[in-house]
Amino acid sequence: MEEFQGYLELDRYQQHDFLYPLIFREYIYALAHDHGLNRSILLDNVGYDNKSSLLIIKRLISRMYKQNHFFISANDSNQKKKLGYNKNLYSQKISEGFTVIVEISFSLQLVSSLEATKTVKSYNLRSIHSIFPFLEDKFPHLNYVSDVLIPYPIHLEILVQTLRYWVKDASSLHLLRLFLHEYYNWNSLITSNNFFFSKSNPRLFLLLYNSHVCEYEFILLFLRNQSSHLQLTSSGIFFERIHFYEKIKYPVEEVFANDFPASILWFFKDPFMHYVRYQGKSILASKDTPLLMNKWKYYLVNLWQCHSYVWSQPGRIYINKLSKHSLDFLGYFSSIRPNLSVVRSQMLENSFITDNAMKKLDTLVPIIPLIGSLAKVKFCNALGHPISKSTWADSSDFDIIDRFLRICRNLSHYYSGSSRKKSLYRIKYILRLSCLKTLARKHKSTVRTFLKRLGSKLLEEFFTEEEQILSLVFPRASYTFTFKKFYRGRIWYLDIFCINDLINYE
C-alpha cells in the first residue's frame, strides 16, 4: 500500500484535501481495469476488455482538459452525434476512476488506523465461509432470530453527505452528484435494491452502500458494547465525524439526546445478541425473550430513522423462533435441528441407555433455486433434466469441458459446507450430463456412443478436490467405503471472496 501511496501522490493531494486532480491520471483507469488494488474487489465485468483501451482513456482525459461538457441530456441526440463519442462509456470510465481514488484513500486511512491501534489484519476473515463456523458455534445456543432487510436512504443526497465525512474534496463530491444524476433519477424519493446492486457500475454503488451501512453499524456496535452502562459512562467518540476514526470530547449522551426520546435512550444488558450482515440484509439473533427482541427491533428502527434518515417499518421485521425457522443465508438454507446421540452406560450389573439431544446448525443446498439458476442459463430444463448448451457447441472440446469443470468445481467448492451431499451430487450430475450432451451435439452423435468412445476419463475429471485427495490417500479398493464414510463432513474454505452468479439466485 505504501508503494501505491507514493505512486499516486496521495500525500501531496491529501494535505490540501484534493482528490479531484487524480481523475486526470491514466494509471487510475489502469487500476480500475485491473479490478482494484491487490485484487481486493473481485467483481466480474463481462465484456470489459473489449471496451478498455489506452486510446479511449487518452481521448477521455483530453476532452476533460478541454472542458468539453459531454454530460448532456440523453434526449439531446443531435449534440451527442455532433461530438461523436459514447457518453455512457465515458461517464462509466470516469466513475470507475473516481471509485478507485476513494477506495485508495479509505484503504490508507484504514491501514494507518490498524497500525496505530496495533490491530492484526486477518485476511481469512474476508472469506464468505468464515461466518459459518461462527454460526455453528453461536446459533445452537440462541432462541430467537430476526431476518431484517436493511432500508435505503430516502434521497441520494444522503449518500453524498455520508461520504462527505470521509472525503472533504468538494469538487469530488460534486462529481459524485453528477454520476448519481446520470445513473439514477436524482429526484426520486425512494431508492431500491436495484440501485445499490446495479451491474452498470457495481464498484461505485457498492462503495456508496458500504459507506452508508458502515455509519449506522458503527453506532450499533458501540452502543451494543456500552449497553449496560451507557448512562453512567461518557465516551469520547463523536459520530458526526469528519475523519475516519476521529475522537473528540463530546459525550455520547449529548449526541443522542437530540435524536432519541428519553424512553429510547436506556438500554439493557444482552450478552447473547448477535448481528450479521449479508447481501443487503442483516440477522439479529438472541437468547433472550421475545420482549427483549422487540425492544432491540424498535431501537434499530429508531436508529435508522433518527440518525441515518431512512424509513423503516417495525411491522416488517419479524421475530421467529430459531428452532422452527430456516434462514436463506448466503446461498444456504440454515436451520437448527436436534442431533440425537445414544449413550450406553453400565454400573456394576446394571446398564442403562441415555438419549442426549444436542442442537446443531444444519446447512443445506437450496436445490430448487439452484436448479432454477441452472435452467436460466440453459444447462437443464425447469424440471432439472440436463440439456445441451447450444451456445457452446461451436467451441473446442477442451474449452467446453473446461467451462463445465470450472462451474462444477466452483459449486462444489462453495457448497462443501453442506450437511447433506445428496443435493450437491444431483447438481454435479446435471452438469456432467449437460457437458456430454453438448459434446455429442457438436460431433453429431449420441451421448452413449460418445461416452463409449471417450471412456470414463471424462467423468473422473468432474471429481472435486476433496474427492481427489481421498482417492490419493486411501487405496482404490477401500476408497468407495472411505469416501462415503468421511466425505459427509462439512468443509469451510477461507479463500472464497465472491459468490458465483449461479449461487446468487436472488
From Swiss-Prot:
Pfam families: Intron_maturas2, MatK_N
Keyword RNA-binding carried by entry: yes
Keywords: Chloroplast, mRNA processing, Plastid, RNA-binding, tRNA processing
Gene Ontology CC: one annotated term: chloroplast
A single MF term (Gene Ontology): RNA binding
GO biological process: mRNA processing; RNA splicing; tRNA processing
Keyword tRNA processing: yes
Localization annotation: Plastid, Chloroplast
Similarity field: Belongs to the intron maturase 2 family. MatK subfamily.
PANTHER family associated with the record: MATURASE K (PTHR34811:SF1)
Physiological role: Usually encoded in the trnK tRNA gene intron. Probably assists in splicing its own and other chloroplast group II introns.
Protein name: Maturase K
Organism, scientific name: Prunus dulcis (Almond)
Lineage: Eukaryota, Viridiplantae, Streptophyta, Embryophyta, Tracheophyta
